[in-house]
């Protein structure tokens, strides 16, 4: 049989978001949204002092193009790693502090990329905006 999902059937899409912070200020937040023409996501984890931020963000188009950027920002600066199957990208010409991996990625969208383990609870939808 067929699985009926009204949000996808009408093209409205679906989204989730979360935001957490512990008593000393360590935090994580993110969102994931998908619809008939693709989707986007973002995740970030950081320490209470602002010394380290680790995260990822990305997008997927309906035609199978996909870009996922993982990053780390610390005392050494901002360093990103870009994974994409987009046409026209040349991995031999990386921008400063960025590594572009022009690898064949799956064309099926399975949701966001998680750069690590998530410990905690998702915040209800009505919790603030990012």
Swiss-Prot record:
Keywords, sorted A to Z: Cuticle
Residues in Chitin-binding type R&R domain copies: 24-90
Pfam families the record matches: Chitin_bind_4
Cellular component per GO, a single term: chitin-based extracellular matrix
UniProt-listed PROSITE patterns: CHIT_BIND_RR_1, CHIT_BIND_RR_2
GO molecular function: structural constituent of chitin-based larval cuticle
Keyword Cytoplasm part of the UniProt annotation: no
Any coiled-coil regions, as ranges: none
Protein name per its UniProtKB record: Cuticle protein 14 isoform a
Source organism per UniProt: Limulus polyphemus (Atlantic horseshoe crab)
